[in-house]
């Protein structure tokens, strides 16, 4: 059976939803075709695509399937006003308590977001002449991007354009070169002092519960990932996230995401920046 048929696409949508909660809209056929080709490469599979999907349904190649169909668009300091808020409002307030600050980056992708958080903490410590101790939990469902994030190696030609003017990349990255098809390529590698601040773990936001304590986190970043879920599932995920956020803690959402049922339990202090005022009942 040809893998461009609607039957195959419908089966992929059903599988993706059952395994991750991610909903693919009707206009994603070209994307699905490209991801199918990636799936076949990842599985090193030479048979019929429908047979492969049946194997995935039976529990084989599940990791390869998830890694092939999740979207990982990100960059350093994306929506940089959130990092300015973290540096100029949140961290100065939390530094007064003298307690360790706990941050959850719930859609780590290839690591640019959690490393941007870590850099922001370092910058805040310099500005405040303080030593705020921070632990960052960075999670994602895609094991391949988590490994990329742990390695912490990025192309300089792309990444150098992503840093705000007040960030000096050489403080936080080591430069190195490697040969590529187009000649010598400059890479940057995250320094160990940043890596030590972050723990990377696999986590499916669609899981019924998360392996964290109630009110464990002072800050949660959940940006540009809810858009891949249905409105109903977005609401469910937000309520689960909310359970793990301290009262008075800050939640950052992506520019096109909203709090839905939780809007009456927070105070908005900026563009998709929310302070939790009370628990959801």
Predicted features by range, described:
Residues 132-217, 221, 225, 233, ...:
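Extended basic-aromatic, gly/pro-enriched interface segments that bind polyanionic ligands
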